Structure formats: C-alpha cells, structure tokens
Amino acid sequence: AETFVRLSDEKNIDKITVKDIVEACGISRQAFYYHFQDLLEVIEWSMEQAFGQLLDRSLQEDDPEIVLNDFIAASENAAPFMQKLFRSQKREQVEWLMARCVRSYLQELISAKGKLPRIPYEDLDIALNFCTYGFVGLLLECCDKKKTVDRETMARQMYRLLQGRIGEADPVRA
C-alpha cells in the first residue's frame, strides 16, 4: 500500500499497474495476488488501516472536540493522496470506500465509548448514515486544496452541531 502511494507521486493513479507495484516491492505477482485481488483492494486495505489507527487514537481520548480535531487533521494529512484518487477513474469506488470506513469508524467509536442513550436500531442507523455522509462531505472539502480549514474551529462547530447547539454563539469567539 505504501508503494502504491509512492508510485502515485511518480505517475497518474490510473496508469499504476500490479506489475509496477510488484517490481517496486521486489515481490512476485503471486505474492501480490495472495494478499490483494486488485489495486482497488490495496486502496481499501490502506483506508481501513488509516481509519483503524485513527480509531485507536480516538478511543484513548475523552474530549470529543479533540477526537474531531484529530479526525480533521488525519483528513488533511491524507489530502494529497486523496486528491489524486478523486481525480482518477476510481473516484466513485473511493468515495464509497471512504463512506464505509467512516461509518465503521463512527460505529466502533460509539460502541466503545457507549455515550449514546439506548435508541432503536433504526434511529441509530439513520443517525450513523447522516453523520457518515456529513463527515465524508467535510473530508472531501478538506481534500480540496483550494480551501484552507481551521481545524479547531471546524471541530468546535462539528461538536456543537452533533450536540444540537450549532445556532448558539461559539464560546471561544464570544
């Protein structure tokens, strides 16, 4: 996966082949296919690893604003590679993978933190979908190199939104 990211610095993502990866890694095609079915699975594995690491850090933190700030920072750090993926023919699949990873991240975080009141599954499902696509939209915005993001402000705004307090004055700016 790291080799794929490195190769994306040298050539267009749509032009990277399994042959390029196996040559750069010094492994056989058989070894590649033992671990991955195709290049999209490499991207998927890479995203799952990144969100897994983010989840581990998030579970160690008690302050939701810091968790959100870390989430935004991770998005900014991944932005150069994500921009390349979004300009590729794989954009639609990458957006779907991102939504799946974000939803899994949120579900695991909620489950581990146990901070939600008992709500019916259908309500939790719609809340997860709503948050997932809101977060993915913000991630896409963070990946837009033309837009600069104030992480701390965005984290506060997201936290107030999740608490249903978005219309209230920002205590930091007041």
Locations of the language-model features?
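A short secondary-structure junction motif
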Residues: S46-Q53, A78, M82, S104-K113, ...
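Amphipathic alpha-helical packing segments from all-alpha helical-bundle domains
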Residues: N69-D70, R91-L116, E122-G137, Q163-G167
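Basic/polar phosphate-binding segments, predominantly the helix-turn-helix DNA-binding elements
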Residues: I21-I43, A74-N77, F81-L85, Q89-S104, ...
